[in-house]
Amino acid sequence: MAPETPAAAPGQSPVQGHDSPVQGYDPRTGTPAGAPLPAAPAAEVDRAVAAATAAFSGWRAADRAAALDAVADLLDAHTAELAALADRETALGEGRLTGEVARTTGQLRLFAGVLRDGGYRDTVIEHAGQARPDLRRINRPIGPVAVFAASNFPFAFSVAGGDTASALAAGCPVIVKAHEGHPHTSLRTAELVKQALAGAGAPEGVFGLVFGFEAGVRLVRAPGIAGVGFTGSTRGGLALAKLCAERPDPIPFYGELGSVNPVFVLPGAVAERGAELAAGYAGSLTLGSGQFCTNPGLIFVPEDEAFLGEIAEAVAGTVGAPMLAERIHSGLVAGLADLAAVPGVRLLAEGKPGEGPWAPTPAVYAVAAQDFEANAEKLREEHFGPVGLVVTYRPDEAGGPAGLVERGSVGEGHLTSTIQLASEDEADLAAARELLPGLERIAGRIVFNGWPTGVAVTHAQHHGGPFPATTAPAHTSVGAAAIRRWLVPVVYQDAPAGLLPEPLAG
């Protein structure tokens, strides 16, 4: 039996799908949502891979751009239907989900624009010179890609999400392993994607969808698959990475795993806007029931009882909301019991309980910096949910926040890190300068005077970070640069003009 595979995100069961039907649930009630869907048998996975392999040739960039636009247009036209369906399976709210469909279609159109711009090819032409051949380099697609959908974003990181959009843009056929947390949403989204692609004249087999644990294992092991994209838990990601590495022909694995996204609040910021910071923190921490990979799970604040009181007051005003799955909820409850048992840790504040069997109570715990460092490995574990740990420090002791980073207490890899400072305060500016070199080593995005939860889909975005945040810190899963994961450079040396790819023929 294969190693435990994946969960495409926290909440995906490592055992559901062993040739058993995939059943979604309503997180508000814990009852089944829709009929179970059959897991894909081996023959179905093999057919999907064979079709994807056959489709991998000659899909022009202009046609890919038109196809991505067509998918975006059709998903937009079905926004209300999709949001209602996803709300039944995720309880994330139709308003949030409507916005997420728009984010997803915006992503698709962004990559259509990337294709029309052409810069993703990274073409370089060096004409022959004295004792030097004619060399022409261009990026080419790697081949069919397997995408493991995530639980917490049923559109933007799922069937038609960023991994799928960027791979299709690169010219790579995609087979999505659906997340069992929203099976009917996945199925309907896939139907619309296939309809739009067919209408745009895309090659048959360029997109596929499979359900089930065993299907995911077989997909990763399939000889025709050239790369894997994943968003989810560290445990699930490492299991998949192992499968990729153990193939006779190892393939790249791009995994976004766990992150606690440390926030550093400097003294001047507390003096300038303490209540505002407390409210912003509570809002970011509990957004979406804390089920964001960019959730600010670890916050370092000056030793200041008044500010701790403002944080406690802000958190006390929050209300719990259903989590995506029973397993996520029970995992959070168990993790918090472990957290509360660590020496020096105390409960600072709790919000109001949410409604439903999977709705946790938002909570914030506190610990002094010296106790945190004594148990850092345990205390920087990710707790996926509306829960945070406040670490109080003395700015003039042990190097302050920068000392915590330099000693490795904050951890080695995060998607984000945040500095809250008073921009006109010289002491804060000096402390921030001391922090920056360390944060540049451990985080892919550094936020100033904001909160890390939102991740803009832009050309400049980098959503990645050193392990264990991701398995490939040089790459991003959000933004235009995400296409680079699915490309490989090829150099043509002294090639006859008639054999060169069109962009190199000039």
Q: Each predicted region: which residue ranges?
A:
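Short, glycine-/Ser/Thr-/acidic-enriched flexible segments
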Residues: N152, G181, E214-A215, I225, ...
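C-terminal core of ALDH-fold dehydrogenases
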Residues: E355-P360, V410-L500
